[in-house]
C-alpha cells in the first residue's frame, strides 16, 4: 500500500488514474481546483475511505494547508506524486492563459514538496512541446527540440509545459526524484463532453446529429491512445528510477478525415454531415509518437486500437450526454 498524491485528480486522466490506483489498495489524496476537473467524476469515490479530496489551486499558497492534511491523513508520509494539474484542451487553456502559465510554473512548489517527503514525482508534460514538427522529425522522438511559436495563441500551454520541464531538469540535478512523460492525444471515459478536443467533439456531434466539424482540410494527422494504455504507462514509469523524458502515445496515425468517417461508421444511426472550418493558428499539421524509449524502459506498448477504443468511448458518451448539456 502506497500513499499517493495526485494534482488534477478530478480531470480526465486523473479520474482514470485514481480508479486504477485505488484498485491496488493505495491511499490517495487528490487536489483539484475544479477549473477543468469535473465534480461529476467524484461520484464513484464518495464512499471510498481510501480516496481523499482537497479543493485547492496550486497557483496560490495552498501548500501549508496541504502539508497539514498530509500530516493528519497520511501520517506525514507520501510515496508518489503525480502532477496532472493544467488545462490541456485549447478551448479551456485559452480562456485564462496567464493562469495556464502560472499552473505550469507551480511545478517548483511541487518539486519542493516531493523533496520534503522524499517522494517520486511524475510530471505530465505533453506532445505540444514539439510544436508543429517538420517532415524530418516525424514521428517525434524525445531528442527533437521542437518547433514552437513562443508568441502564438497556444504558447501559454506549449511554452508553459516546456519551462516546467526545464524546472524539473534542474531540480532533478539537486536530488528531486522526478520524471517527465510527454503525453500524446488521449481519449476515453471521463472526458468532458465540452472540452473541445477532437474525439469528444466528433463523437458528441455525431450522437446528437450535429455537423461533425473538421478544422482545416482534414489531412492533418494525429496518433490517438486509449486512456487505459496511458494509465498503464504512467504507473509502470513511476516504478522506475528514470528521469526521461518519455513519449506515451499510440503510434498509429490517422487524419482528421479518417477519424470523422470512422466515428460516423461506428454511429450508423447518426445523420451528421462533415463540415470544414478554418484551421486555428499554430495548430500542428502532424503529430505521431515515437515510443521506442518507453518500450525499452518499461515495456510500454499500446494494446487498444482506435476502432476498439472509440467503441468504448461512444458507449460512455451515450450515457454522459443524458446528464450533460453539450455546447458545441
Explain the meaning of each model-derived region:
Residues 14, 60, 191-192, 223:
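Nucleotide-sugar-dependent glycosyltransferase donor-binding/catalytic pocket residues
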Residues 136, 152, 191-195, 252, ...:
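Residue-level signature of the cytosolic catalytic core of signaling kinases
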Residues 36, 189, 250:
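Short, conserved catalytic or interaction motifs in soluble domains
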Residues 1-184, 228, 312, 316, ...:
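N-terminal Rossmann-like NAD(P)+-binding domain of SDR-like oxidoreductases, especially those catalyzing
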